[in-house]
Amino acid sequence: MNKDELKAFVLANPRLVSMKPAGDGIYVLKYSKRVFYEDLWNDFLEECRGTIVDEDFNVVSRPFTKIYNYGVEAKAPVLANDVKVTAYRKANGFMVAMTWHNNDILVSTTGSTDNDYVGYAKEMMLKHMCWEDWVLAIASNEGHTFMFECVHPSDPHIIVEKTGMYFLGWRENSWDSRVHGFDCDTVWKIFAQDTIKCHAVESYHMTVGELVAESKRVRHEG
């Protein structure tokens, strides 16, 4: 992603994406509801799902790029039934990103650094370990963004999920980074359970055909 092209797009399209101030010269990029309902996604908007940038659009925090629903959205990948994949159970909560910024943990959701959901996330973080231990874990990995699914009792869903933080993966704070975690099961599960003492989502190795069939039987979200 070219940061100058992204900045030009964001500034030229306020009806499609907001640039919400988050203090100290940083901004949260968030797509509008119109993008979601009218399926207006493009390469720029795919990155505007809670990414935090400075005034020059250098990355401060970079959560997931948009992931398309397989078999539902037109831009989702198309794979043959015999292709082998690794699937991860989707925890039923809301996305949280963390990075080290200005000598503290910067916690954010897909659109804010100071809403109720950020408060919920911080509350759930303390169920796993004390704030000082979180500071040590995140500060020792400065320059990276860590992604979680947070399940909080004040954000109920039809499918009941165990409360807490579910570690999903991490990536470097740069525009050319890729998400890590999904390609190294053992390492990231050890990090989730031993270093940050969070839940780790289950993974399954199977073919696409087997996965599609299994998705019709399971009772969790996806």
Question: What residues fall within each predicted segment?
Answer:
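Core nucleotide-handling region used for phosphoryl-transfer chemistry
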Residues: 1-222
